[in-house]
Curated annotation (Swiss-Prot):
Top-level division of the source organism's lineage: Eukaryota
Subunit annotation: Binds via its C-terminal region to the N-terminal region of MYC. Associates with AKAP1/S-AKAP84. Interacts with MYCBPAP. Interacts with CFAP91.
Protein name stated in the entry: c-Myc-binding protein
Keywords noted in UniProt: Cytoplasm, Nucleus, Transcription, Transcription regulation
GO biological process, one term: regulation of DNA-templated transcription
Organism lineage: Eukaryota, Metazoa, Chordata, Craniata, Vertebrata
Amino acid sequence: MAHYKAADSKREQFRRYLEKSGVLDTLTKVLVALYEEPEKPNSALDFLKHHLGAATPENPEIELLRLELAEMKEKYEAIVEENKKLKTKLAQYEPPQEEKRAE
């Protein structure tokens, strides 16, 4: 009987933890939103993931990574543009490919 009470006590502690941290409230809201959807989505799991993801605050590291990605994209575009210009310049000094083969 003591084993049963210990398991029950752990469950109750876990339930209180979920309640205090807002997990139960958030899950309930998302499930109610799914229930109230006039047209049910094909994937209920995707619906839950999307709505739960929107409910959690952004990790600051994610924003830093987004900024870094934007910077890298800009650098990439600049390098691609520079590469095009250098290829054009180089083409002026090199004979066309067909002339090279004839030699």
